[in-house]
């Protein structure tokens, strides 16, 4: 099973995160399938590759709680629903 999860990058006291599609059995810093976004909580910046995220969601990937909150804020789920109807 694939999950959309945050992968920590950056340096001490200055964390930034990549949003990645990764196998559920892999560690947080393990090999990812694809990088689909970027999140900087300090500057409150987010970059999302929406077509890649929609692809993984349609294939059954499950976002973690934090990633789901980021996707809701960016209104990604509104783009997903019309395609499924």
Swiss-Prot record:
InterPro entries, A to Z: Ribosomal_bS16, Ribosomal_bS16_CS, Ribosomal_bS16_dom_sf
Domain of life from the UniProt record: Eukaryota
GO cellular component entries: chloroplast; ribonucleoprotein complex; ribosome
Signal peptide from the UniProt entry: none
Alphabetical keyword list: Chloroplast, Plastid, Ribonucleoprotein, Ribosomal protein
Protein location: Plastid, Chloroplast
Keyword set includes Chloroplast: yes
Principal cellular location given in the protein's record: plastid
HAMAP family assigned: Ribosomal_bS16 (MF_00385)
Family per record: Belongs to the bacterial ribosomal protein bS16 family.
Identification of the protein by name: Small ribosomal subunit protein bS16c
Organism of this sequence: Nicotiana tabacum
